[in-house]
Amino acid sequence: MQELRLVLIIVGALAISALLLHGLWTSRKEKPAKFGEKPLGKLDDSNRDTEGFDHTGVGSVRIINNAPEKDVAVHTSQRKEPELHFGEKIHADPLMDSPASVQVIDDMADLPRMSATSEKIEPKFSSDSVVPDPVATAVEEEPVRIAVEQPIQSEPASVVSDYTEVLNTPISDIPEVSEQEVKPEENKVLEPEPVIANVVPEPEPEPEPEPEPVLAPSYIALSVHARNGEMLQGAKLFQCLEQHNLIFGENAVYHRHADLAGTEPVLFSATNMVQPGNFPEDGGYNFETPGVSFYLMLPCYGSAKNNFNLMLQTVQRIADDLNADVLDHERAMVTPNRIAQYREKAKLYSQA
């Protein structure tokens, strides 16, 4: 186990030493030469032709003026803010500008104006060399002359030749062109299309309900008539009428009111069958009559149907008490059909 550890330590030390040696050798091999050790004119001489231009057409850098750098005194004066100058010479700020920039500004002011059509030529340096800070020198760029050939306008020879041939042709040989007769077009009258209006059907007015016919005043009559030619006696007759809630009243006849006290409206009345149809006011113990008639006037107070049923019931009871017969309005024996007709008539007035 210890031998294996010792072997690993030795191998690790050898590997570290090899890496260090390889790094030193690589750094020395790739160490670039200083830019100042070689003259400026000898850079990339192998890539230039006999006239001094490289394969891109860029010539060598020419120094036209190498004025000594002016000493710029640095004062510890108060810092100035940058100002705008229109047409005046720009004064360098010792706090804002460096000596190199001041030299560049002074040299650029003395340079002649360059042509706008000249191309910018940049010097090409090798990638292995370290570029130091450039020296502020003015470089005059030579304008590149470009020969522009003016296009030659060619005359239309074919047009001229055709024009001369037309002029040389005699007039007799020119074919005559007959004018085509232009027939005037007939103005067609456009008939307007019938416009079909969307007729919205008006809603039909609902028929107004017909007013119910006004029933004319009428009556229903029943009579109690004595049998076998006998007469109804006054005292017995009056007592029987009063027992069935009939009250002697207006016009000297008996009335059945809506209430038993006689204060409500009259429902039906009982009169004498003999003219003038009234009863004696003094009691009339000697009074006699062949019969008594009951009348229900239509329209009446309350329900005509109920009033008729009440009158029919009263007439039947009085006829039973007096041993008499019940007659209709024609003085004939009343029948079930006649009673049904009376009820239908009373029903009509009840709905009115």
From Swiss-Prot:
Key word Flavoprotein present: no
Cytoplasmic side stretches: 27-352
Keyword Oxidoreductase: no
This protein's GO CC annotations: cell division site; plasma membrane
Ranges for region Disordered: 35-56
Periplasmic side: 1-5
GO biological process: division septum assembly; FtsZ-dependent cytokinesis
Segments traversing the membrane: 6-26
Cellular localisation: Cell inner membrane
Compositional bias (Basic and acidic residues): 35-54
Membrane topology category: Single-pass type I membrane protein
Superkingdom of source: Bacteria
InterPro entries hit by this protein: Cell_div_ZipA, ZipA_FtsZ-bd_C, ZipA_FtsZ-bd_C_sf
Keyword annotations of the record: Cell cycle, Cell division, Cell inner membrane, Cell membrane, Membrane, Transmembrane, Transmembrane helix
Purpose of the protein: Essential cell division protein that stabilizes the FtsZ protofilaments by cross-linking them and that serves as a cytoplasmic membrane anchor for the Z ring. Also required for the recruitment to the septal ring of downstream cell division proteins.
Subunit and partners: Interacts with FtsZ via their C-terminal domains.
HAMAP family: ZipA
Family: Belongs to the ZipA family.
Entry protein name: Cell division protein ZipA
Higher taxonomy: Bacteria, Pseudomonadati, Pseudomonadota, Gammaproteobacteria, Vibrionales
